[in-house]
Amino acid sequence: MSELNMTPREIVAYLDEYIIGQKEAKKSIAIAFRNRYRRLQLEKSLQEEITPKNILMIGSTGVGKTEIARRIAKIMKLPFVKVEASKYTEVGFVGRDVESMVRDLVNNSVLLVENEHKEKLKDKIEEAVIEKIAKKLLPPLPNGVSEEKKQEYANSLLKMQQRIVQGELDSREIEIEVRKKSIEIDSNVPPEILRVQENVIKFFHKEQDKVKKTLSVKEAKEALKAEISDTLLDGEAIKMEGLKRAESSGVIFIDEIDKIAVSSKEGGRQDPSKEGVQRDLLPIVEGSVVNTKYGPIKTEHILFIAAGAFHLSKPSDLIPELQGRFPLRVELESLTEEIMYMILTQTKTSIIKQYQALLKVEGVGIAFEDNAIKELAKLSYNANQKSEDIGARRLHTTIEKVLEDISFEAENYSGQNVTITKELVQSKLEDLVADENLVKYIL
């Protein structure tokens, strides 16, 4: 099965390994992502006519909204960016403008393509790095030597390369020439200013400018890898492919969309700039051209997924034009005690497995009794009911509290197997059991 060619059923099966429940949300998102692939198989003229059906996900924090979209984008190798609507300001105000989310998507897309090209050239890059270091470690062969000497040198070079690959010479120091560290560019400024910045930097910081550095062989490997990658990769082709991929397959996840909804409940306290951000967002979601440092990008075929809890507002509090641009609505269920238990026991990379792996590094074995896991799920669920509902994130705070002493004094438990019982969970979370001092468990 190719990741790019996953069917909706295969996508949902993949998501089931990491996210419990939320069948309707998984199904809707899987179809939307599959339609990205279907559209690209059509004739060019028909491709232009088909625009993505943007999705509005409604559900409390910690129920899996972001994780569903992020997981699919990752497995399907699609350009993806997650942003928070509340971080943007209306044009004319101090802060980030909404177009910067598209520029962030393009940056991620170019990086994705660059990493793919590096992976294809991985062996070639590593060979070039090892050869360059080996030649630095071996004294150069004088001119006019016999064929026999040349062969001996070639054999010595080969042996040296093998030792470098095996890490035998990692601590040896060598002097190499590396490019001067490039000046950081603020990608949040408008593209016109970005281009001016880049031109100024190129003028004062020519590519051939290099400095000599004494590094260990291990450090030299990394320094040369980055430099040789730049010489072997076709930068322009990568930029063009990244721009094209963002335009045709990009996904922008806008979290906290409810924070810019103008709620009637707020009365006179409402922020007038919220509606301004919505109106700035509208042309991007509808389809417009945004200038980036890599060139202009059309946004009409980018898939937008908006998400929010909508505790203090309703989806209908968004301006009607923006509501119309998110025709698919999915409501995610709040997490029950049973689902909390399943999250701890059935997901591929459950929180329990993560903590077991972390403590195994210190030589500490951790085992959870089933009753202990059920108690963790129960107490986490109760905490969500009695204070702010933060979904599965509550499990992180409760497990962290239970394992806090073991994590802190891990060296004292090295070589031991520790069993987490129901009684231990209750004693560590006694404030939670007694419904006291809940603030400790609120993120």
Curated annotation (Swiss-Prot):
Its main location: cytoplasm. ATP binds at residues 20, 62-67, 255, 321, 393. Pfam families: AAA, AAA_2. InterPro entries: AAA+_ATPase, ATP-dep_Clp_protease_ClpX, ATPase_AAA_core, Clp_ATPase_C, HslU, P-loop_NTPase. GO terms for cellular component: HslUV protease complex. GO terms for molecular function: ATP binding; ATP hydrolysis activity; peptidase activity; proteasome-activating activity. CDD domains: RecA-like_HslU. One of its GO terms (biological process) is protein unfolding. Transmembrane segments: none annotated. ATPase subunit of a proteasome-like degradation complex; this subunit has chaperone activity. The binding of ATP and its subsequent hydrolysis by HslU are essential for unfolding of protein substrates subsequently hydrolyzed by HslV. HslU recognizes the N-terminal part of its protein substrates and unfolds these before they are guided to HslV for hydrolysis. This is ATP-dependent protease ATPase subunit HslU. It comes from Helicobacter pylori (strain Shi470).
